Amino acid sequence: MSGRGAGGFPLPPLSPGGGAVAAALGAPPPPAGPGMLPSPALRGPGPSGGMGVPGAAAFRPMGPAGPAAQYQRPGMSPGSRMPMAGLQVGPPAGSPFGTAAPLRPGMPPTMMDPFRKRLLVPQAQPPMPAQRRGLKRRKMADKVLPQRIRELVPESQAYMDLLAFERKLDQTIARKRMEIQEAIKKPLTQKRKLRIYISNTFSPSKADGDNAGTAGTPGGTPAADKVASWELRVEGKLLDDPSKQKRKFSSFFKSLVIELDKELYGPDNHLVEWHRMPTTQETDGFQVKRPGDLNVKCTLLLMLDHQPPQYKLDPRLARLLGVHTQTRAAIMQALWLYIKHNQLQDGHEREYINCNRYFRQIFSCGRLRFSEIPMKLAGLLQHPDPIVINHVISVDPNDQKKTACYDIDVEVDDPLKAQMSNFLASTTNQQEIASLDVKIHETIESINQLKTQRDFMLSFSTEPQDFIQEWLRSQRRDLKIITDVIGNPEEERRAAFYHQPWAQEAVGRHIFAKVQQRRQELEQVLGIRLT
């Protein structure tokens, strides 16, 4: 029996054993006689009726599994023939050469390529596996020479010793960096001496006859210049300051109050105050000018600007802890050490503190939680006492002691803190180390490549024949992987491989794909859909 497909392609006659080709073209296979099984082309390796192909994965069944595993088109009655030329067959149009090829219902995505004689995997190239990329990165990051190279070049042991020393050095530097980071979080200060200079000048009043004119006349002296006045200056500097940047005098204080004699200047004009504000401009000193021709007793109250803030303890708690003025964290630490030393923590409920007689007087309770201590401690903390300096403003022109010096202790930032911050922020050495690491990685990779080439040439010089055969086998395996070829080339080069039952099924599918392709081309040319 012969016929023509869509587009006039001649169809080969169906042989009695060509049930697979007939099924591919839509015709039912020859009926099986009594005691006969369906054609091997339609029988699979299992009960599902799938087709077994040597060297490839088996197809899924193309239709309902049954005694004959016959393909049945949806919508067709059992036993009817598939329409041939001129009739709508198969799925909608699509290129048979790509992933969108028209497939028969039930056909898996894997199909026969029209120009190849073996089953193909999907055409899309799989991306490089993540494991291979990760292995490459690890190989690039590895600076250790392989054992085979160390055995070949004994001098490489010196490099391995340097590598071990570098590893220890990196661990030490990393540990020191962590210690520096922890140290920077804490306030690093050191005590320095701040010398305060308090001086005053006196301007006596001028006699009326000293000037040619009087106030209000041309050439006269203003009335304000006739009044005697004095000027007080408060300045200071750090002693033995190694830093190049000098700190302003006002930066050491939170507030400064100058209290003059109330009897001389009255209750409303005897105080001169300066308080730090967020917008305060730092200055090198303070000066106060007032009228007067008498010696004036004054009191300077200097409130230091502690960073972090410090507090003065209640006298009872200060005697108990041995701390007078300190930061809140230091006070809490001293309190905890006292509790631990005197075993005041409850043995069963560890969050409770059993107060002794001193704590009962201070906290006014016999038992309290440890979490309640900060709240109770807030009422026992006060602002630290200011620095009090008593000074006499002298207006006697014969008095040579018009400048007084006072040394006070202040806390300044440790210069080492700035160096540690610069060390952590510096990336110059890190960039240099990274560039050297890249060079080492490239050198190690080059050494490995040279070792591979040496092994290649050494094997070839030792056993040329065996080496060439093994090399060809390796290249053949690589070629199959690169070209995505599935199968056994040794079997495929023999004619008996193509006389197996699967070949007839493959021919039928190839012809069916060609018929579909030609039909779609005719529809596009005629602009109609054949029915």
Swiss-Prot record:
Residues 306-383 form the SWIB/MDM2 domain. It is found in: Nucleus. There is a cross-link at residue 226 (Glycyl lysine isopeptide (Lys-Gly) (interchain with G-Cter in SUMO2)). Keywords: Chromatin regulator, Isopeptide bond, Methylation, Nucleus, Phosphoprotein, Transcription, Transcription regulation, Ubl conjugation. SMART domains: SWIB (SM00151). Ubiquitinated through a signaling process involving RAC1 and the RING finger protein UNKL. The modification Phosphothreonine is found at residue 217. One of its GO terms (biological process) is positive regulation of myoblast differentiation. GO terms for cellular component: bBAF complex; brahma complex; chromatin; kinetochore; nuclear matrix; nucleoplasm; RSC-type complex; SWI/SNF complex. Pfam families: SWIB (PF02201). Residues 34-45, 210-225 have a biased composition (Low complexity). Residues 20-85, 205-226 are annotated as: Disordered. PROSITE patterns: SWIB_MDM2. Gene3D superfamilies: SWIB/MDM2 domain. The keyword Transcription regulation applies. The modification Asymmetric dimethylarginine is found at residues 81, 104. The modification Phosphoserine is found at residue 203. Its main location: nucleus. PANTHER family: SWI/SNF-RELATED MATRIX-ASSOCIATED ACTIN-DEPENDENT REGULATOR OF CHROMATIN SUBFAMILY D. Component of the multiprotein chromatin-remodeling complexes SWI/SNF: SWI/SNF-A (BAF), SWI/SNF-B (PBAF) and related complexes. The canonical complex contains a catalytic subunit (either SMARCA4/BRG1/BAF190A or SMARCA2/BRM/BAF190B), and at least SMARCE1, ACTL6A/BAF53, SMARCC1/BAF155, SMARCC2/BAF170, and SMARCB1/SNF5/BAF47. Other subunits specific to each of the complexes may also be present permitting several possible combinations developmentally and tissue specific. Involved in transcriptional activation and repression of select genes by chromatin remodeling (alteration of DNA-nucleosome topology). Component of SWI/SNF chromatin remodeling complexes that carry out key enzymatic activities, changing chromatin structure by altering DNA-histone contacts within a nucleosome in an ATP-dependent manner. Critical regulator of myeloid differentiation, controlling granulocytopoiesis and the expression of genes involved in neutrophil granule formation. Belongs to the SMARCD family. This is SWI/SNF-related matrix-associated actin-dependent regulator of chromatin subfamily D member 2. It comes from Mus musculus.
